[in-house]
Amino acid sequence: MASSHSSSPVPQGSSSDVFFKKEVDPTKHVRPVQSLPDVCPKEPTVTDQHRWTVYHSKVNLPAALNDPTLAKRESDFFTKTWGLGFVDTEVIPSLYLPQISKEHFIAYQQEISQREKIHERCKNICPPKDTFDRTLLHIHDKSRTDLEQVPKIFMKPDFALDDSLTFNSVLPWSHFNTAGGKGNRDAASSKLLQEKLSHYLDIVEVNIAHQISLRSEAFFHAMTSQHELQDYLKKTSQAVKMLRDKIAQIDKVMCEGSLQILRLALTRNNCVKVSNKLKLMATVHQTQPTVQVLLSTSEFVGALDLIATTQEVLQQELQGVHSFRHLGSQLCELEKLIDKMMIAEFSTYSHSDLNRPLEGECQVLEEERLVSLVFGLLEQRKLNFLEIYGEETIITAKNIIKECVINKVAQVEEIDTDAVVKLADQMRMLNFPQWIDLLKDIFSKFTIFLQRVKATLNVIHSVVLSVLDKNQRTRELEEVSQQRSAGKDNSLDTEVAYLTHEGLFISDAFSEAEPASAAVDTTSQRNTSPHSEPCSSDSVSEPECTTDSSSSKEQTPASATLGGVDIIVSEDMRLTDLELGKLASNIQELLCNASDVCHDRAVKFLMSRAKDGFLEKLNSTEFIALSRLMETYIVDTEQICGRKSTSLLGALQSQANKFVNRFHEERRTKLSLLLDNERWKQADVPAEFQDLVDSIADGKIALPDKKPAATEDRKPADVLVVEGHQYAVVGTVLLLIRIILEYCQCVDNIPSVTTDMLTRLTDLLKYFNSRSCQLVLGAGALQVVGLKTITTKNLALSSRCLQLIVHYIPVIRAHFEARLPRKQWSLLRHFDHITKDYHDHIGEISSKLIAIMDSLFDKLLSRCEVEAPAPSPCFRNICKQMTKMHEAIFDLLPKEQTQMLILRINASYKFHLKKQLSHLNVINDGGPQSGFVTADVAFYTGNLQALKGLKDLDLNMAEIWEQKR
């Protein structure tokens, strides 16, 4: 049996490759069977035979889609139902997979070729020990056949007789059953089973022995090298022990002390952190009582800062602490309560600030309280506090007027407050002096009120600007810190961090073990006070005491000093620069709105007094006083708020327009009455009018405040002397000059009516010109006044009056030009038109005088005969009329104008005389007729030149004769 199993089952290397492969495959049956997971259950189970499982699948979807035998008619299997998108497409090669060629293996071949050569050389030096031949192969086949006789159950890796199934399979119970008459047969079966098992054992032992014999040399080599291996292991063990001893000594000398220092430093830092945590928890625990104390003293900013800091600590340092799980929500509710308290406190402050007595200096009421409130409101983004202040200003403005009216009415004894219940009706019972005093009081109170509002808003504006400045400086510091941190990151990247056995970086350990104070050395501090506390609650600047959130903030809160109050601008101000800028502009707008409110209330006060026509009945002096008072108040409010309010200015302009209309209508009516009663005779000039004209010449265009006492003793003059020129005038013109000065003075007193006054004055001058023309040239005075005739003296006096007005028109123009804005200078052209109209009127009067004499000459000379005696009666009559004309105009008109009129009259005389001589055929031939004419002309010339101012007048009488041809 042993010989039958001595053949080797391993094929030899002399066989061909094909034979080798075929012979190697059966050896796989000799290997131990590997246990694989059961896919299907081995034991019979009850299953649903109709239930479909994955094991029923015969063809999968990829196989169906990639079927090479797909018929052409089935190419539209998917497209006919699902669309043209479901068609066979060619798969594009991946762009990420390179094309592999032989060049890619060149480096590998060069690297492996050397190893291959060494391998081949070793094969040649050490040939295979086992050689295969046909005999061994036969023996191997025989041994394999013997092994196949052994049941497979003995070859299982999980073979165990303690398993009942395995035991029953190996030793069936039927061989041990001794019942009945079958005992002998069962004994034989048991013996046969024992022999069979022994046979199986022999086969296995033979195969094992054969395998050992095949590897005998390896066993002997292993046994031989065992002693050498033991020596190597012993030496290695000794070397390892020595190395471990050295490492232990090195660790004890060089590392253990340092690591112990690190452990102690870490332990110390951890203890410090725990201590600081406990102190922080104790501080946080006192937050609510501290907030209550701060609120009791109205320290809203401090309370809000404390709440914000506590919230930050709860979220960062004390996150997850169970005892503080409800503190965050409680602080949020407390913060909402503080918001309501601040709004109520600011409303109370506004009421008390604006309703205090309007007397004394305009100081801010409790500036510290105001600054604290504003900072708190800004920190909480409660920006509607300005609306509260604006509403309070409206209410206060109403109360100011009401209080002033009540006080004034109480001072007037004539007003029965019991009979007149309404306050507005009581106010209307005041006369102008009382009412103007009341208005002065109201304007004074409004001015003080606005100054107080401005002072308060300036404090609020300063707070807003300080917060805005803090935001800008914080951004600058953040930019600088970012640049520095970027530089630090670059330097930290180059540092080497060593990892200890506890997983801590040494650099981190040393950084955490830095001294509590920068001025004290670490070693000396540890030696001098090893048990001292590294940090206290007060020394928050030390690194151990700083929390993560506080240490990360490099910027310190900005401080501001407002009105002597030091305020720390919190880092938690959540307002943007845009919001702060808008808030600052709203503060200025609020001041302007307060001014507008005061103006609106003043307008309502004026309108309530004007209901009964009180303002329209004011005289010039009273209205000017009212206008100046209102203009002064408008200027004062403009200086306070920097913007001119228009409501009161509009009301003043409206009343001024009404005043101008009434003023003009009164003067126009007065002038019309004067002209209608004017008899156009020369009037005496009182001394006050002469003084008035003199003051105009001195550049003072205004009426005197009082009538000088010296003028009452002076007698009236015959003429008005203006800059050395004498003007004979009628009484209407004197009063017209005074009226013109009233217009000019009204412009000075009320500059806003300059334009209206200019148009009204030009209208008045036009009216005087047209009306005087109607009365004198148009002979309207005959019916209006009852004159019998319009004499040459009337005409000359009218002309001289017009000349006086023309003299003053440039003065009036210059006065208005100095008070009109440049863009309205075009209105001054009306004075040019008026001047032209006046000159035309004066020319028409001169023409009228000439026409009178012309008709007289035509009448007298047409009946004149050249005969004795000389001078003839006709010429005597002409000389008489010329003398009357001269007497009528010489004292009224200036000398130059008189001479010009005489020359023009003389020309008319020569024209008619020449015409008559031509009619009579009288020529200058030296005959008797020419002698008579020459005597008459000489008489006329002598008589005319004998008059005042006409002595040197060149009459040129030779023109009366026809020129000889």
From Swiss-Prot:
Query: Record's superkingdom?
Result: Eukaryota
- Note the coiled coil stretches, chain numbering: 228-249
Its keywords, alphabetically, are: Coiled coil, Golgi apparatus, Membrane, Phosphoprotein, Protein transport, Transport
Give the GO terms filed under biological process for this record.
Answer: apoptotic DNA fragmentation; astrocyte differentiation; cellular response to progesterone stimulus; gene expression; Golgi to vacuole transport; homeostasis of number of cells; homeostasis of number of cells within a tissue; in utero embryonic development
Residue ranges annotated as compositionally biased, kind Polar residues, are 520-558
Q: Where in the sequence is Phosphoserine found?
A: 8
Q: Where in the cell is it found?
A: Golgi apparatus, trans-Golgi network; Membrane
**Could you tell me which cysteines form disulfide bridges?**
none
Checking Pfam families in the record gives:
Vps54 (PF07928), Vps54_N (PF10475)
Q: Where is this region: Disordered?
A: 516-558
How would you summarize where this protein is expressed among tissues? Ubiquitously expressed at low level.
Gene Ontology molecular function terms on file: syntaxin binding
- Keyword field contains Transmembrane helix: no
Provide the Gene Ontology terms for cellular component.
cytoplasm; cytosol; GARP complex; Golgi apparatus; membrane; mitochondrion; perinuclear region of cytoplasm; synapse
Q: Which family does it belong to?
A: Belongs to the VPS54 family.
Q: How does it assemble?
A: Component of the Golgi-associated retrograde protein (GARP) complex, also called VFT (VPS fifty-three) complex, composed of VPS51, VPS52, VPS53 and VPS54. EIPR1 interacts with GARP complex and mediates its recruitment to the trans-Golgi network. Interacts with VPS51 in an EIPR1-independent manner.
PANTHER family for the chain: VACUOLAR PROTEIN SORTING 54 (PTHR12965), VACUOLAR PROTEIN SORTING-ASSOCIATED PROTEIN 54 (PTHR12965:SF0)
Entry function: Acts as a component of the GARP complex that is involved in retrograde transport from early and late endosomes to the trans-Golgi network (TGN). The GARP complex is required for the maintenance of the cycling of mannose 6-phosphate receptors between the TGN and endosomes, this cycling is necessary for proper lysosomal sorting of acid hydrolases such as CTSD. Within the GARP complex, required to tether the complex to the TGN. Not involved in endocytic recycling.
Question: How is this protein named in the record?
Answer: Vacuolar protein sorting-associated protein 54
State the gene name recorded for this protein: Vps54
